[in-house]
């Protein structure tokens, strides 16, 4: 197994939990003192706060599922890694990615020695608006459509 595989798996677990609208499963991917920064800039600071933040979103909003492509996984130490990815969303009732909500994901993952697994210390979604560069938005959207067509959440 490559050294970055557990971090990629953690990222996919986060996406799958989001896609299944499962606040508890998504929060379980985080350290007790983990942080999340949403696409809209909202923040939740702690595993419990992340679950509390996501529960009403999933209960009252038809959240769109993600498809994503990992750009880089870089180890900062044997216990800390950064994953950078691009992601798109397929709005409910549609079959295509909405370029207006393409995002850049950043995951800071830490090895949890006690549990012998990896957890998110920070997960951030930043809009991939790329103002004034519609060709870049179109290229990213096509790249994400390729992932979507393969029927996978993440590549």
Regions found by a protein language model. Give the residues of each.
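A beta-strand edge to alpha-helix "cap/lid" segment located at domain peripheries
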Residues: 1-25, 35-155
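Helix-loop segments that flank and shape redox-cofactor active sites
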Residues: 32
């Amino acid at each position: 197994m490559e050294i970055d595989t557990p971090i990629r798996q953690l990222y996919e677990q986060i996406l799958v939990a989001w896609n299944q609208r499962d606040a508890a499963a998504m929060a379980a991917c985080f350290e007790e003192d983990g942080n999340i920064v949403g696409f809209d800039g909202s923040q939740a600071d702690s595993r419990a706060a992340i679950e509390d933040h996501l529960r009403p979103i999933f209960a009252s909003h038809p959240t769109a599922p993600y498809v994503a492509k990992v750009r880089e996984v870089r180890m900062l130490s044997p216990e800390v890694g950064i994953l950078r990815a691009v992601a798109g969303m397929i709005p409910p009732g549609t079959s295509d990615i909405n370029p207006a909500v393409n995002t850049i994901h950043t995951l800071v993952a830490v090895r949890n020695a006690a549990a012998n697994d990896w957890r998110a210390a920070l997960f951030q979604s930043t809009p991939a608006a790329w103002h004034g560069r519609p060709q870049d938005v179109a290229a990213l959207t096509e790249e994400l459509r390729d992932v979507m067509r393969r029927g996978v959440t993440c590549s």
